[in-house]
């Protein structure tokens, strides 16, 4: 929930940069998972949830304008 509150404070440009960062992080976690080196598998779910939250906020900010 804390991340969602922080995401809501950001403008669209910051949300896009956050989305790119999260997508890169998701890619890196997937590569670690495939190679068997992922020590914290719960991070995949957390990053995926954050990506969904950012995309939802971006869509809602687009509808407002």
Curated annotation (Swiss-Prot):
GO CC terms: ribonucleoprotein complex; ribosome
PROSITE patterns in alphabetical order: RIBOSOMAL_L29
Keyword Ribosomal protein: yes
GO molecular function: structural constituent of ribosome
GO biological process, one term: translation
Keywords for the protein's UniProt record, in alphabetical order: Ribonucleoprotein, Ribosomal protein
Pfam families xrefs: Ribosomal_L29 (PF00831)
Ribosomal protein listed as a keyword: yes
Entry's family note: Belongs to the universal ribosomal protein uL29 family.
Name of the featured protein: Large ribosomal subunit protein uL29
Source organism per UniProt: Buchnera aphidicola subsp. Acyrthosiphon pisum (strain APS)
Lineage: Bacteria, Pseudomonadati, Pseudomonadota, Gammaproteobacteria, Enterobacterales
């Amino acid at each position: 929930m804390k991340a969602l509150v922080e995401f809501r404070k950001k403008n669209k440009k910051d949300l896009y940069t956050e989305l790119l960062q999260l997508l890169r992080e998701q890619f890196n976690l997937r590569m670690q998972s495939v190679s068997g080196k992922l020590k914290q598998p719960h991070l995949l779910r957390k990053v995926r949830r954050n990506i969904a939250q950012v995309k939802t906020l971006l869509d809602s900010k687009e509808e407002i304008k």
